[in-house]
Each structure stands twice: as structure tokens, then as C-alpha cells.
């Protein structure tokens, strides 16, 4: 009968509507992730975290809900290469962009472009300092200033008595691969300020010498070099390579009064180790230079376990990658997101 046919047509129409809405609910999101590098085990670990979290989300959804592309420059000093990678990311019109900028100035125009397209940007690791207001929705990163302080405290526990026993001045070196990226600069400043604070508690004055950016960037109270119990010498290479960091570290390791040295990221810490290969001055003994590093690549881990390097601060790069994916997805779905500290710890 006509009624039955009509009922059937309506039922079929209803099914079609339901089917369409089921398909419509299968939202897919593509993310572009522009990292600060690709070369170190650190960035590979961030990538592992993004892959693992993406797989979990897709498995849970029962379809490929998220896809991403992860790129980074050959070296962290290669600003031009990262600019073109970020430009490609913006042009791809993704649901959101993950970004760790190698430079604080170079991306202002491109970020404004992403903003005008309403593409959320999530900072990770060093994030995107100096970005226009509202462009970066949230960051997945270690609190780098605090992490520099963690490195200083770890070192201080080992050298405090030696400083007290020293007749004259002592020198603590710091090698930073650059003076532009947020993570390294904040880490470097966090270390210096914490050493100044710990020294002041013992009644010792510190002088900060070397690279101008860090000399001017300290917030702690410093004294003239001649009056200082502790000289903090900061050196920065011309580009972000291990061998160039090694050259800077050698200068510090060759100073008579050096008792400790800090390499503020994987590249700088490996530079300290390379410098030591021809000098044999670092170790864990009271007559040796106490080296402290950052990150937990295999070279640094091996040096810590054999005692060449006293200790290092480890971040959670896999955790950064995982949190990054969560923040990218939430921002793409229009949820409110906030900065997430991914933590760090000192290990010996």
C-alpha cells in the first residue's frame, strides 16, 4: 500500500540522514609540526611521543582522526630553512600548527598570516617567544628557567665544599649553543641566577663574564670581577654545532681556576665532552672539573654513568610530543587550552 511505501521511503530517508550524520561526526584533523631540529635524539624522542599519542587517539576513534607532518631544520642555527618550513606549514592550511621557533624575531609576519587564517599555533619545547598576542594558544614545554636552576642545584651540592676550601677565586663555566632561542637562553639565565642565589646564601659574591647577552640578562646581584669569590664565565659559539661548542668549552676547561662547567643542551653538553677528550680534566673527583649537562641522549647518559660527567638534567621529550598532540587536537576542536609544564629532573 501507499502507506507502507511511504513509511519505507521515510525509513530509508531517515537511515540516510543517520548515516550522513555518522560520517559527518568522523572529523579528521591534519597538523603541521615544525620542530627546532631533527638531528638530535632529543627531537627524535619528541617525534616518538607525537607518533605514539596520535596512534592512541586514532585507535580509540576507530578511524584516522589525526594525521601530521613533522619537520625541522638540519641545524638549530639554520633560521632560513626553518622559515621556509614554517611558511609551507601555514600554506598547507592545517587544523593547527605545532611550532618550536629557532629564533625570536624571524617569524612575526608568518605568524600574523597564520592568525589571519585562524590557524591555532601550539608552542612546544622553546615555544614561540615574541609571537603576536593571541597567536600561540598554549605551550607544551619544560619551564626552562626553572630547569637551569635544577642544573645549578645539582652541581652546587657537589662543589660547595670545594668553593669554601678554595684559597682564591673559582670559576664556573657555562656553554650555551646560542643566545636567541627561548629554551637555551632561559636555561642559561636560570642556571646563572641560581648559582648567584646559592652563593649569596654562603656570603660569596659572583661576577658574570663572557657573552654579553647572558652578562646583561642576569637578575641576581653581581660584584666586580676582582671582588668575586666565584666567576661565572659564559661562552657561546658562532653556530649550533658540537665541535664549535667544544672549542668554547676548551677555553673554560683550560683555565687554572675552573672547578665546574655546564652545557645547557644536548649539543653544548656533548661539546663539553668532546673538549674533554683531549684534556682529560672532567670527572667526579675533588681535583677534577665537575661537568653538568642537559638532556639524556646516549652520549650524555654514557658519560654520566662512567663519571666523566657528574650529572645532567633530563627533560621528558616523549612527554612533550604527547602533550603537543593533545593540545593541537583540543585547539583544533575549539576547546580552551593552557600552557602545560612537561617537567624535568637531575640525574647522576
Residue ranges and their predicted role:
Residues 23-348:
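A residue-level marker of the well-folded mature domains of exported/periplasmic proteins
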Amino acid at each position: 500500500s501507499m502507506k507502507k511505501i511511504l513509511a519505507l521511503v521515510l525509513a530509508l530517508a531517515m537511515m540516510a540522514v543517520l548515516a550522513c550524520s555518522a560520517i559527518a561526526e568522523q572529523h579528521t584533523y591534519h597538523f603541521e609540526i615544525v620542530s627546532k631540529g631533527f638531528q638530535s635524539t632529543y627531537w627524535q624522542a619528541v617525534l616518538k611521543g607525537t607518533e605514539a599519542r596520535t596512534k592512541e587517539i586514532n585507535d580509540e576513534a576507530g578511524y584516522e582522526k589525526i594525521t601530521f607532518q613533522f619537520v625541522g631544520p638540519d641545524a638549530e642555527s639554520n633560521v632560513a630553512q626553518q622559515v621556509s618550513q614554517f611558511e609551507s606549514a601555514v600554506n598547507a592550511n592545517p587544523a593547527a600548527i605545532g611550532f618550536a621557533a629557532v629564533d625570536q624575531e624571524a617569524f612575526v609576519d608568518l605568524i600574523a598570516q597564520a592568525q589571519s587564517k585562524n590557524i591555532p599555533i601550539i608552542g612546544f619545547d622553546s615555544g614561540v617567544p615574541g609571537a603576536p598576542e593571541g597567536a600561540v594558544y598554549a605551550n607544551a614545554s619544560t619551564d626552562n628557567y626553572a630547569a637551569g636552576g635544577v642544573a645549578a642545584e645539582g652541581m652546587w651540592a657537589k662543589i660547595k665544599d670545594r668553593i669554601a676550601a678554595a684559597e682564591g677565586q673559582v670559576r664556573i663555566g657555562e656553554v650555551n649553543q646560542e643566545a636567541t632561542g627561548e629554551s637555551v637562553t632561559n636555561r642559561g639565565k636560570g642556571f646563572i641566577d641560581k648559582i648567584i642565589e646559592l652563593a649569596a646564601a654562603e656570603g660569596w659574591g659572583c661576577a658574570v663574564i663572557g657573552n654579553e647577552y647572558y652578562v646583561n640578562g642576569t637578575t641576581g646581584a653581581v660584584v666586580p670581577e676582582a671582588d668575586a669569590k666565584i666567576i661565572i664565565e659564559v661562552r657561546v659559539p658562532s653556530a649550533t654545532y658540537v665541535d664549535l661548542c667544544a672549542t668554547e668549552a676548551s677555553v673554560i676547561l683550560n683555565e687554572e681556576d675552573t672547578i665546574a662547567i655546564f652545557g645547557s643542551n644536548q649539543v653544548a653538553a656533548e661539546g663539553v665532552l668532546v673538549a674533554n677528550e683531549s684534556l682529560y680534566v672532567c670527572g667526579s673527583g675533588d681535583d677534577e672539573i665537575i661537568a653538568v649537562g642537559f638532556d639524556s641522549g646516549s652520549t650524555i647518559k654514557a658519560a654520566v654513568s662512567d663519571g666523566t660527567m657528574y650529572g645532567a638534567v633530563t627533560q621528558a621529550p616523549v612527554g612533550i610530543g604527547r602533550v603537543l598532540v593533545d593540545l593541537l587536537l583540543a585547539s583544533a576542536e575549539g576547546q580552551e587550552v593552557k600552557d602545560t609544564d612537561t617537567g624535568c629532573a637531575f640525574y647522576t
